[in-house]
Amino acid sequence: MCRVTLEQIFQHHITQKYVNRSGMVHAIAVAYHAFHHTSVDAATKAGFLHDIGHHTWYRNGEWDYELYKKNDIHAIKGAERAHKLLIRLGEHPKQAKEISVAILLHTDSFLLEQALERTPLQNIIKWVDEADEEPGGAHHYRTISYEKALQAIKRLDEMVDRELQTQQSTSSAPISTNEKAEKIC
C-alpha cells in the first residue's frame, strides 16, 4: 500500500466540503501542531481531519455557540466521515481506524462526565486542537485561499515524508522487498 498523502486528502471533494465548513485554517494549524509529536503520519492526518464532522448551529441567522456546545456530536460524525474517506483513498485499515478513533476522542463535548484514558495520539489531537481554539469558536472562521492552503499541505507532506525516511533509515530492523515497495511508491 502506498502512503495516502495529506494532499490527496485535501483535494478530495468530501474534505473540501466539510473541512472548509469547519475551518480550513484551523485544520491546517492543528495538523502542523500535531506533526511535532507521536506518529507524524497518523497525527497530521487526524489533526487535519479532526473537525470534519462539524455541523453549524444557527439561531435566527446567527451562529449559536451555546447551542453548539449543548448539542454537539461532531467528533462522532467526524470519526465516521474520516474513516470512510481514508479507506476510499487507500489508507491502511488499521491506520484509518487509529486516526478515526483519535478524531472521535479529540473533544469531551459529547461525553457524559466520564474520564477516559487516551492513547498518546488521541491525547495529542485533543491538546493541539485546544491549543488553536479561540473564544466563541472564532478559530473556525479564519480564512485562507485554496492555493495557500494547498501550499501549506504540500509543505507538511514533505515534512512527514522526511520524518518517515529518517525513521526508516535509523531503524535497525531489515526491511523486506514488499515493505520497501510499499513505502517508496
Tell where the protein language model's regions lie, with residue ranges.
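Post-HEXXH active-site segment of zinc metalloproteases
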Residues: 60-75
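Conserved acidic
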Residues: 22, 70, 74, 95
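An active-site-proximal "capping" alpha-helix that borders the catalytic cofactor pocket
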Residues: 30-33, 72-89
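Acidic/histidine metal-binding catalytic segments
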Residues: 39-45, 89-104
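Catalytic glutamate of the conserved HExxH
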Residues: 51, 55
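Divalent metal-dependent phosphate-bond-processing catalytic cores, especially two-metal-ion Mg2+/Mn2+ enzymes
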Residues: 14-41, 49, 59, 91, ...
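N-terminal export signals and maturation junctions of secreted/periplasmic proteins
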Residues: 1-18
